[in-house]
Amino acid sequence: MTSSRPVAVIILAAGEGKRMRSTRPKVLHHIAGRSLLHHVLSAAGALAAARTAVVVGHGREQVAAMLAEQAPEVVPVVQDRQHGTGHAVRVALAALGELAPGDTVVVLPGDTPLLTSATLTALVAQHHARAAAATVLSAVIDDATGYGRVVRDGDGAVRAIVEHRDADAATATIREINTGVYAFAAGPLQTALARLTRDNAQGEEYLTDVVGLLVAAGQPVAARVVDDPGEAGGVNDRVQLAAAGRVLRDRIVEAAMRAGTTVVDPRTTWIDADVTLEPDTTIAPNTFLHGRTHVARGAVIGPECTLTDTTVGAGATVLRTTAERAEIGAGAVVGPYSHLRPGTRLGREGKIGSFVETKSADLGNQTKVPHLAYVGDAVVGERSNIGCTTVFVNYDGVAKHRTVIGSDVRIGSDTMLVAPVTVGDGAYTGAGSVIREDVPPGALAVREGRQRIIEGWVSRRRPGSPAARAAAAAGVQAPGSVGDPEHPDEMPQPSAAEAAVPIPAHQGDVAHRSELPHTGEGEAGIAGIPGAGSRT
């Protein structure tokens, strides 16, 4: 906003908010990814105030900490004793320093998250245009019970603000209410504040009394009726908190759609206030976008995604995924059922597939982790493939250690990479290997476990079982019993403990797996290495 008159903003946030029934100050409760106070500060930002003060009282340390982190330019002002809104403004003015009589002071409640920048800008513009000593933001509602009424004279000028408990029968019929939002000229405001008394039932200094004092002094007082009365609604309990959250959600989703985002089902889509969406993005149902998440053009998110402070590149697809503080490259594919923990970076056209968890993992362009894997504290180069059920073993019980995987590497299925360890460019690991030592570039690392075949074991040790019947149907003839002199190499008879173990109704077949790599590429085999391929 451009104005020839400097603007100062005072936000009243000292109340306890007892109806919230919370140890957290009311103004720090969140909707749409921001605290109530943060929403008010954001709306007031359009005024380009030279100085902004927030009056704090209950939970002052928590509120001051929030301001230091999110709005360090704002001055927190402590109201030690709750002597009313007039007293709070007087304390804030003293902290803001000297103001010229013609400067504008805007006063806002800290619990009105639905106020918009447009409304505040219009309020101040009217205040300046009419050269008013005070301009009240009012609202016209059907049921004004409990609200202070704005009383006007025959010319429409404001004569007074009358609290509900003090209203006579005629005043009680007025539907125009005071929202608690004001624009004042600094000089008349300071003069009126000095004349406030606490001669009332509450023993407090009311800011509403300033209006009456200004009128009595012959100063012009105006009112601007807000276009949407809902904007001025305060949040006093958790029911109202949820209601305000619904309004903000609808606003944000509608704005996103009008800016070029397809939201398939607005009713099941939640987008925080600080999320940014480029045009031609698609948000599928049951998706939650939190924090400072950014989604680039052409990306598809959802269904059933929760992304927090996550960046998604152009044309990426993210399905049924949870991600926190992660980066997903352009054209990448993530999900379903993936969990990208903080520090995950997936490069361009990469893949993180089903039931994969990553943490502090930098995965290069076109690198793939298709399914059932844990990748933590790792750097992986480009075009590498991490086979199914691979685990980056990063924790020794005391400290975390890093694994480094080069480019064009094939990690076989069920590999355990025990950090710290490095696998060089173009290297392979065999399926089922435990890699504890560095693997040179282009090498194959295999941890052998010799396979032993005992012919006829099922027929002798599991007679009558489905497996034995299947073996017989396949033409397998059982050799003699264990201990038969013709079969001295057979296993010995079971011990008493072994014999006591019940024989299961069905035993799965023993897979004859190659000890050479399963790369996860989905190929039938790699030239010269039979059985080296595996599913992806």
Swiss-Prot record:
Region feature Disordered, mapped onto this chain: 461-536
Residues annotated as signal peptide: none
Region of interest: Linker: 239-259
Subcellular location: Cytoplasm
Active site (catalytic residues): 371 (proton acceptor)
Ranges of biased composition (kind: Gly residues): 522-536
This protein's pathway: Nucleotide-sugar biosynthesis; UDP-N-acetyl-alpha-D-glucosamine biosynthesis; N-acetyl-alpha-D-glucosamine 1-phosphate from alpha-D-glucosamine 6-phosphate (route II): step 2/2; Nucleotide-sugar biosynthesis; UDP-N-acetyl-alpha-D-glucosamine biosynthesis; UDP-N-acetyl-alpha-D-glucosamine from N-acetyl-alpha-D-glucosamine 1-phosphate: step 1/1; Bacterial outer membrane biogenesis; LPS lipid A biosynthesis
Keywords, alphabetical: Acyltransferase, Cell shape, Cell wall biogenesis/degradation, Cytoplasm, Magnesium, Metal-binding, Multifunctional enzyme, Nucleotidyltransferase, Peptidoglycan synthesis, Repeat, Transferase
Biased composition (Low complexity): 464-483
Cofactor requirements of the protein: Mg(2+)
Composition skew (Basic and acidic residues), residue ranges: 509-521
Region (N-acetyltransferase): 260-536
Residues that hold UDP-N-acetyl-alpha-D-glucosamine according to the record: 12-15, 26, 79, 84-85, 148, 163, 178, 236, 341, 359, 374, 385
GO process annotations (BP): cell morphogenesis; cell wall organization; lipid A biosynthetic process; peptidoglycan biosynthetic process; regulation of cell shape; UDP-N-acetylglucosamine biosynthetic process
Binding-site residues, acetyl-CoA: 394-395, 413, 431
Cofactor binding note from Swiss-Prot or TrEMBL: Binds 1 Mg(2+) ion per subunit.
Catalytic activity: alpha-D-glucosamine 1-phosphate + acetyl-CoA = N-acetyl-alpha-D-glucosamine 1-phosphate + CoA + H(+); N-acetyl-alpha-D-glucosamine 1-phosphate + UTP + H(+) = UDP-N-acetyl-alpha-D-glucosamine + diphosphate
Pfam families: Hexapep, NTP_transferase
Gene Ontology cellular-component terms listed: cytoplasm; membrane
Main enzyme class: transferase
EC number assigned by the record: 2.7.7.23, 2.3.1.157
Region (Pyrophosphorylase): 1-238
PANTHER family: BIFUNCTIONAL PROTEIN GLMU, NUCLEOTIDYL TRANSFERASE
Record's subunit section: Homotrimer.
Protein family: In the N-terminal section; belongs to the N-acetylglucosamine-1-phosphate uridyltransferase family. In the C-terminal section; belongs to the transferase hexapeptide repeat family.
Protein name: Bifunctional protein GlmU
Annotated gene: glmU
